[in-house]
Amino acid sequence: MKKNSIQFTPFEVANDGLTIVVNRHNTWVDDMSVDELRLLWSEDGREKRWSQIHSTWPREQVKFYAPGVDSGTYDYFQNVILQNHRIVKKVSLSEDDQVIMQGVMNDKHAIAFVGYAYYMANRDKVKAIKVNGVFPTKETIQSGKYKPLSRPLLAYVNNASIRNKMNVANYVEFMIQHVGNLAEEVGYVKLRKEKYNEQLRMLTEIKR
C-alpha cells in the first residue's frame, strides 16, 4: 500500500466478526440472510416493519441502532451488507457501543450491529443471530466461515521505518508474537498460528 509515495504494509493482528444483535425477548428472528439484512437496513422510503421480511413476523416497527459513521464497523457493514444502498434514515447512531447495547436491551423490536467483542461482553443481555445460517463464534470467525461479516484487524506500518529503525522492527516483531493473546483478552479472535508465522516472514522480507 502506498500513500504520498510512502509505502505501508498491513499486518493482520486479529479477527473480528460484525455481530447482528436483537433483544433477548425477540422470539421470531434466529437467522437472516445477507439479502434480508440489506432489505431491512436499506432506506427505501417506507416504515420498516419485521413483517416486510417474513409475513409471519410481527407488523411492529423495527428500531435500528448502529455505530457512528466514522467507525470502521459502520464502514464495513456499509460495504459488505448495504453496498450501494443508503442506511435507513431512522437509525440511532452512537460512537458508544454501550449506548447501542442499551437501546437493544430496552426495546423488543430493536436490532443493531456491533463488533464481536461488544456482543461477548453483553451476551447475557442481548441475542445474537445467525447470518446465512452461521452463528458468530471464535471458530467460525477465525475460519472465515462466518462470512461476509468476518474481517481482519490490521496494523499499517511504514516500510522505511521497519528497515531503518531497529526499535520499530523490534516492536512489530513483538506485536506479531503477542498480539493474538492480547486481542483475545479484549474479546477479539486471534489468527491461526500459521498466519502469525506468515506475518513474521513478511517482516523479515521487508527488513532486508
Predicted regions and their residues:
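Exported/periplasmic ABC-transporter solute-binding proteins
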Residues: 1-208
